[in-house]
Design a protein with these regions (language model features):
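Short, structured segments at the rim of ligand-binding sites
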Residues: 1-281
Length: 281
């Protein structure tokens, strides 16, 4: 199972008849899956996971899921919520999802999921904070225009920040729910001039880079690239709210700190993030 699909495909598989089997490499087997597996079991979906709540596991289904209400701790990943939302309308009784854990990370991704569902006539109601109801119904077909991945624009924007240069990124959407859109807010705070028009986003940096103290809990995927820019700032930077990055394909916080320090930089882990003190590399 690919990393980016390992939390989405199993829920979809519950709507098929048969016994699909899911597995991955050693890193995938270590990634958090318990919240999703427990949720599927609460929905009376038969899962054989040897009681480990990780890959590998098998799902046995007749293709019909009754749905109902579940509570889930998705503090390790918003993907657990999105995966359930995407199929909830095909459950007989729909699905109500309530997050009951610590702070929910990466809310822009959940907002993106809801926005896309509404575009195909799926009714999603926000009942309360971190509490959603997806009504049962037909999912309308649609021809989609896929936006550019704004998070992946980060390295190119970072190159202009670090070299005090200028760059245009074509086709940057004016209205988007993508986490990568926060590059605009972040790099402006670090000293860049940014212009967005109908054709492109322009970033120009002619100043020293300012360090930044920022909660990245909603945009944790931006952390590695932002850390590279912070190395060249004129003051320390602190990133918080990203403890969940320790459960990704690798411990991203530990990997960043190790590699920054190996290059001669100065980075330290904190309880929920890291601190970077700029120094010559």
């Amino acid at each position: 199972v690919l990393f980016r699909s390992m939390r989405f495909v199993p829920v979809l598989a519950a709507l098929t008849s048969g016994i699909p089997h899911f597995d991955g490499d050693l890193h995938a087997r270590k990634r958090p899956m318990k919240a999703l597996i427990d949720s599927l079991k609460k929905l009376q979906i038969s899962i054989d996971d040897q009681g480990l709540a990780t890959l590998p596991f098998s799902i046995a289904s007749d293709g019909v899921v009754q749905g109902g209400s579940i509570e889930i701790d998705a503090s390790e990943s918003s993907q657990f919520i999105s995966a359930l939302m995407l199929v909830g309308a095909r459950f007989v009784n729909g699905l109500s999802i309530k997050h009951v854990g610590k702070k929910l990370p990466s809310l822009p991704h959940i907002k993106m999921t809801i926005d896309m569902l509404k575009q195909v006539d799926v009714e999603v109601k926000e009942i309360g904070e971190n509490y959603w109801k997806i009504n049962p119904g037909i999912i309308k077909s649609k021809n989609w225009i896929i936006e550019p991945d704004l998070s992946n624009a980060g390295p190119f924007l970072a190159s202009a920040m670090i070299t005090h240069g200028e760059i245009n990124i074509n086709d940057w959407p004016k209205n988007t729910t993508q986490a990568g859109n926060f590059w605009i807010e972040i790099f402006r705070a670090m000293g860049a001039e940014i212009e967005l028009n109908d054709k492109f986003l322009k970033l120009k940096n002619s100043k020293e880079i300012s360090g930044i103290n920022i909660d990245l809990s909603q945009v944790g995927e931006l952390t590695p690239v932002l850390a590279s820019v912070a190395l060249f700032a004129n003051s320390p930077s602190q990133f918080s709210g990203i403890a969940h990055l320790r459960g990704h394909e690798t411990n991203r916080i530990a990997a960043l700190v190790e590699n920054i320090n190996n290059l001669g930089g100065d980075a330290q882990e904190t309880a929920d993030g890291l601190v970077i003190n700029p120094k010559p590399l």
